[in-house]
Amino acid sequence: MNTSSPPLLDAAALLRLAQASTPTSTPAAQLPCPCRLQGATAWESITEERWPDALMQRVGTLRDPELHEPTFEEWHPAGTRYDASDAPIAVRHFPFNRCDVYRCSACARLVLRYTEFGGYYVDHRVRVVDAALVTG
């Protein structure tokens, strides 16, 4: 995994990456990938042990380093919920404004990852980037 500081991405940059990283409909692209993230179309908990670190390349971040306290406000204009697979990927809203962006080196799938810090727990979460859902 790349440990250097990733570039800050806006919605347009994330959309370009997502469009370039969408697995094709070829038979090879439909095979299960060793990353095992293809099913994470909504936010999914993932332990450090399950995170496919060797396959993932950090390609950017949605976390603005100038914002010390990004908003916890969510954006659901169509009435979706946080955990819905069709919820918009609104880069300036929670939880996306706390995400790093990764690409799988095996299948080219683009995923978002952030850590939820609860009162008594730490929960790493991941979601596949669907280009059709990316918004500002």
Per-region residue spans from a language model:
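Short metal-coordination and nucleic-acid-contact micro-motifs, chiefly zinc-binding Cys/His arrays
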Residues: 26-31, 97-100
